[in-house]
Each structure stands twice: as structure tokens, then as C-alpha cells.
Amino acid sequence: MKKITLLIILLLSAVCHAQMKSGKDVFDTARYGTVAEMKQLEAKDKNIINSVSPMGFTPLILACYRGNTEVAEYLAKHVKDINYKSDNGTALAAAAVKGDINMAKVLLENKADPNIADPLGVTPLVYAVQFENTELIKLLLEYKASKTYKDKEGRTPLDHADFTKNQEVINLLKN
């Protein structure tokens, strides 16, 4: 019995070591890898960058949430659906939540739709308003984010702005 237990432990150790040596999967690479690593994965499987994790995230969404700018920029230019919607929204929503104006611009330049809401009906513009990120609000409005879209509670971006009491944010939405 001891020999079998020892054999199982050695086998599991070898498997774990092999997995560690083999590198990161596409989702780990999206979070904290490099463009070169992403290209290596893509060379093995062209569609891997369009994968969806068990939690419902694409590599692009994960790269945006983690602030892995170079990988996110690469993915934004190469994925099939830049507007893929997870249970937590799109890659653009992730950039808005993170307050990453540069990433939002890259996504918008690559045809990200600023009017796709998450399951709660919240759009990237509403996130930008809630975080009082005036530069991001301006950018989203430049790319035709809807000022009149209502979330599931019937509130518009201006309603959210009124709650912040930030006059600059309110004025951006009134003009």
C-alpha cells in the first residue's frame, strides 16, 4: 500500500511539474502574459484567442480587467467578436470599470460597441459616470454612447450623474 501511495504521489508530482513547465494557458496569458506568448498559443490553435473560460470570460475581457495592455491591444485587433458579452459585460465594460481610457480607445477604434449593457443593464458610459471619469465619458460620447439608454432600474446615465453630484459629469451628459 505504501508503494502504491508513493507511486501516486510521484505521478502527481510529475504531472504538476509538467503542467508548470508547459507554460500558461490562453487565459493566464491574457491576464499576465506577453504578446509573444499569445502568438505562440495562437500558432498552435488559430481560434484559441476566441475561447471562453469556464467562468464565461474571453482572453480579451481578462486582459482588460487585469490591465494587460499590450496583450489586450493585440487581441482587440485579432479576435472574432470584440463585443463578446460575458455575465460581467464586454471588454469595453472592463476597460470602463478599470478607468483605462487608452484601452477603451483601442477597443472603440476596433469597433467595440459602447452601448452593450451588462446583465444589470449597465453600459460602459454608466460605469464611467459612476466613477466620475470625465475623460472616459467624453471618449465614449465621441463614439456615440447613448445618453438615453436606461438600465434595468430605468435610470439613464444622467440619472446616475445626478447621484454623483459632480457638475462636470452632469454637464457632459446634458450637452
What are these regions (language model features)?
Residues 28-34, 62-68, 94-100, 127-133, ...:
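Ankyrin repeat A-helix N-terminal signature
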Residues 4, 17-44, 54-57, 61, ...:
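Intrinsically disordered, low-complexity regulatory segments in ankyrin-centric signaling systems
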Residues 10-17:
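Hydrophobic h-region of N-terminal signal peptides that target proteins for export
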Residues 52, 84-85, 117, 150:
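Ankyrin-repeat boundary/linker signal
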Residues 147-175:
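Leucine-rich solenoid repeat scaffolds
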Residues 34-42, 68-76, 100-108, 133-141, ...:
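Ankyrin repeat structural motif
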Residues 48-49, 82, 114, 147:
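Ankyrin-repeat inter-repeat connecting loop/turn
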